[in-house]
């Protein structure tokens, strides 16, 4: 290495040296005269040149030469980082020598001070050593023996993940493009060697052809319509051609023509024969013959993905056409009539909960109807099934794929009304018979036969708004008998509670044992109209044994306890029930109470 001639500088006392400070990108240089001198530091990454200040009092003598070059750790840390990043792999001596050379070359000083020059050299090397240790501690560089390798500036986890994802996608795209280029090259080699083999056989059989009939590679073929007007201009050296067409035209290169002549041994397709594969491998070196199998496997994989995508699109199109078209259902046989789906959407109730802005819309998610909610005797009536039975559900679509269209089971309809007046949705007699929430057994035979409510659950029905009573079918289970209003001392009627009682024929005394009695009592919320969603459960029916040994005090205590229970239940029923609670009761009915009449 050639020795470096360092420029001299004038030695100064420590108290007369320029004091340098860095603050917000500006350097403030304190001159010996006491006047500050500042200049803008535009970029710390660019090489900095230290300007020589003018002498004191405007003199330009040798004794007035001053230097404002920085020698701090912050400055040399930036320089060291730039040097290591630029080289990638370096060592301590190389970085220190280059920084020392740059430092003294950027300071033009006419006089030489050997002592000061030696001090600055040691100071710079010490700063470089400290900067390398800082970068090593921050994991920006790595050190192996004397070699120093650049890693990179630290970043956050999200930035590092995004950078790695971009790098991964970029490399995957590069690998994919290189694989395609490799496949094209393999096909070109096979095509060219197959063409050479065919020409050799033809020349051996028919002799060498004339020069006018030989088409040399590479070439281009341009074809267009027979009636098209083509204008062609050729340069003097026949290196440039200018074509003008008045109709569409196509351009084919030599490789495309060779593939159309089947000289690529059908490797561009997915089903080459074993003989063609063997011929193609014979044209390649032994080290590259496995690429033929990889090309065929990749072609088959791409073709399978395209076929799968096409099937999915076709299935989606078929489902959409099935939903949009008015399907004509075929009446199923007796065996198909008993088939029911595991779950179905209750569309009317779900739409009501979704459209009701005052309720919680999350209650509409996943409202289903179970199998026992479907009545078995759906074919009792002779009425034709209309479009109200054509409901959509993913379960029905999955069940009807690749099967003939079938009539779906009847779905219960639950209507919740918010405005006053009678129910807007009136059901047909057939639907009313199916969806009646109680048994069709007459009341006088219910106790004797031991019949219970439909689906072995509590009796539930909605109380409509308005004073107009709904049309009640024949054979109702119970009726509401209002009591006469009692007048208070203020002349205002009391809010008298209503009692739900059974008809006279519904109570049978021959089933009771001596000393037993039937207690039937149910308190309904007084007044009206009731809010939508109010549910009336079945009447409390219990067989109570008369206890003649009970003292009067015990009788009073028992009576008070019963009154408290009734008051608590009355307060609960006075609270309006939301649509979400009604949906929950419909979806998950309460467990059945013990039937004392069985």
From Swiss-Prot:
Biased composition (Gly residues): 55-64
Taxonomic classification: Eukaryota, Metazoa, Ecdysozoa, Nematoda, Chromadorea
Record field: compositional bias (Polar residues): 13-22
Source organism per UniProt: Caenorhabditis elegans
UniProt similarity note: Belongs to the E2F/DP family.
UniProt-recorded name of the protein: Transcription factor dpl-1
Gene field: dpl-1
GO cellular component, one term: RNA polymerase II transcription regulator complex
Keyword Nucleotide-binding: no
Pfam families named among the record's database cross-references: DP, E2F_TDP
Function of the molecule: Synthetic multivulva class B (synMuvB) protein. SynMuvB proteins are required to repress the induction of vulval development by Ras signaling and probably act by forming the multiprotein DRM complex that represses transcription. May also negatively regulate vulval development in association with other SynMuv class B proteins such as lin-15A. Can stimulate E2F-dependent transcription.
UniProtKB keywords: DNA-binding, Nucleus, Transcription, Transcription regulation
Biological process according to GO: gonad development; negative regulation of Ras protein signal transduction; negative regulation of vulval development; positive regulation of cell cycle; programmed cell death; regulation of apoptotic process; regulation of cell division; regulation of cell fate specification
